């Protein structure tokens, strides 16, 4: 399962909270999301609208998936049983997870517009969904008719078996907008490796010099977050970031182990780690630095999801020793105009790589942005503003011509307008 609570961490929960350095505390807000009436809740996914999903105890003692938005936690119900868990949510508000059905089996579900739909299985009795992209493609795993578990990609009512790396089982945990799926698969009867599946091919991502690895999340750049032992004889796990055949050990918060669960489009990674004092704390990793996200009166915290705004979700132990879903919001210094333009250039490049734009269209857009950077370097703000306006005009033409979707095109226009608001008179 995606929310794998590593034994090495849970066994090491100890006394008081280490807390955050004063400078980081000034920029961090931790919000207790409450419960559905019970004493426990856990948050696993968040979209860029700040909608959060997870599960909570109800007042009657059942476990139900929830959707939290603007201070209100909504019970999503079940597929007929007494348990449901929500794992991920996309920008359309579609939620995926798993639930017991009336006969007791566990099935993957898709919730939207107030209705929970059973996604079925690959022929076996159980299935679970863990990731959904904005196209509505769903990643997870299911029992097959032979009784083994295989990763799947579900779309428009069809559940596709993604196969394995040669072993007996595979598990899918996330899918990005390109339809790339991240997860892990057994390569023989004992060892398992992280994989990246794309267009029918399952690729072994290797390990951190150990014998095992697990991939749990993937962003639009194809960067993968997960964990594995840092060397063959290690009994601990370390969070890792995989990118273009390179797998990087993200280290720890001073303790022995760490696990990475989420990654956003900026390459920010979240998860949890043992600290130097032997406690377990949520972390945010970026630019080769792992930051302790602290706790909220209790002894420990764990993080599982992050959106493109840098908001992190997970759970905390409260001062009253309950476990509650939590939302971390870090107020980061605003990006410079140059940094924002660089991000737009990367956005355009991804559209070319995915085939949405052809090379000529991409080059024309990137040329305008690169020339904007040159004008900014010369402090020629009017020329820079003119180039940004030409960029947005070209994007609008691509929308009008049906080449870019309105959502994708408007996203680029909004990014360019954000720069204009800072530099244009």
Region locations from a protein language model:
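Residue-level hotspots at or immediately adjacent to binding/recognition sites across diverse folds
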Residues: 4-5, 20-333
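Soluble extracellular-acting proteins and domains
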Residues: 333-425
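Bacterial N-terminal signal peptides
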Residues: 8-17
């Amino acid at each position: 399962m995606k929310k794998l609570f590593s034994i090495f961490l849970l066994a090491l929960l100890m006394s008081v909270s280490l807390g955050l350095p004063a400078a980081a505390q000034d920029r961090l807000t931790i919000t207790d999301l409450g419960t559905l009436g019970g004493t426990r809740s856990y948050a696993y996914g968040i979209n860029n609208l700040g909608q959060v999903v997870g599960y909570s105890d109800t007042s009657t003692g059942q476990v139900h998936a929830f959707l939290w938005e603007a201070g209100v936690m909504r019970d999503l119900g079940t597929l007929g049983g007494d348990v449901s868990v929500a794992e991920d949510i996309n920008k359309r508000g579609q939620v995926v997870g798993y639930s017991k059905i009336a006969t007791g089996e566990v099935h993957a579900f898709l919730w939207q517009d107030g209705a929970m739909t059973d996604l079925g299985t690959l022929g076996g009795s159980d299935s679970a969904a863990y990731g959904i992209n904005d196209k509505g493609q769903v990643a997870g795993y299911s029992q097959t008719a032979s009784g083994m578990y295989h990763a799947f990609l579900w779309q428009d009512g069809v559940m596709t078996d993604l196969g394995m790396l040669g072993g007996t089982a595979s598990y899918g945990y996330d899918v990005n907008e390109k339809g790339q799926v991240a997860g892990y698969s057994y390569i023989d009867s004992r060892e398992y490796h992280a994989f990246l599946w794309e267009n029918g091919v399952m690729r072994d991502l290797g390990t951190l010099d150990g014998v095992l690895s697990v991939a749990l999340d993937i962003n639009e750049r194809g960067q993968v977050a997960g964990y594995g032992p840092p060397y063959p004889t290690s009994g601990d796990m370390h969070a890792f970031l995989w990118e273009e055949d390179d797998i990087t050990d993200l280290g720890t918060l001073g303790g022995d182990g760490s696990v990475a669960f989420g990654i956003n489009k900026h390459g920010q990674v979240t998860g949890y780690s043992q600290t130097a004092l032997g406690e377990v704390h949520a972390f945010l990793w970026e630019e080769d630095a792992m930051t302790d996200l602290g706790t909220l009166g209790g002894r420990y915290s764990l993080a599982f999801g992050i959106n493109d705004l840098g908001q992190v979700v997970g759970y905390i132990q409260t001062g009253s020793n309950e476990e509650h879903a939590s939302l971390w919001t870090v107020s980061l210094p605003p990006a410079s105009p140059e940094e924002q333009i660089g991000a737009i250039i990367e956005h355009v490049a991804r559209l070319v790589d995915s085939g949405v734009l052809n090379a000529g269209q991409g080059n024309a857009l990137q040329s305008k942005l690169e020339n904007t950077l040159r004008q900014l370097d010369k402090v020629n703000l009017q020329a820079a503003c003119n180039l940004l306006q030409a960029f947005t005009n070209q994007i609008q033409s691509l929308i009008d011509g049906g080449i870019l979707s309105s959502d994708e095109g408007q996203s680029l226009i909004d990014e360019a307008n954000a720069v204009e608001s800072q530099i244009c008179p």
